[in-house]
Amino acid sequence: MANNKSAKKRIQIAERNRLMNKSYKSTVRTLTKKTLENCEKYKKNPNEDNKNLVKTSLNKAFSLIDKAVKKNVLHKNNGANRKSKINNFVKTTLTTK
């Protein structure tokens, strides 16, 4: 247990940061799943609306991953790997007919 005031404050700060990081990671996972779901939807019914839906969800996911990397929630290599996996899935989905 913390013995002085500054150590107690650091515990509070660490807990606050942990919760914010958890929120960011959760949102990244959610947007990744949404993008993959939209890809599956496009596979079943390939039309312009579904294609635009895939592209917008991809942009949102990339944006949030970049922000998480910028705030040191994710390591830059981890962010790059996540973006690469999503992008490869989307690319194969959009090119396959």
From Swiss-Prot:
GO annotation terms (biological process): translation
Superkingdom as given in the UniProt entry: Bacteria
Pfam families in the record: Ribosomal_S20p
Signal peptide as annotated in the record: none
Family of the protein in this entry: Belongs to the bacterial ribosomal protein bS20 family.
Assigned keywords, A-Z: Ribonucleoprotein, Ribosomal protein, RNA-binding, rRNA-binding
UniProt-listed InterPro entries: Ribosomal_bS20, Ribosomal_bS20_sf
Protein known as: Small ribosomal subunit protein bS20
This protein's encoding gene: rpsT
An MF annotation (GO) of this entry: small ribosomal subunit rRNA binding
GO cellular component terms given for this protein: small ribosomal subunit
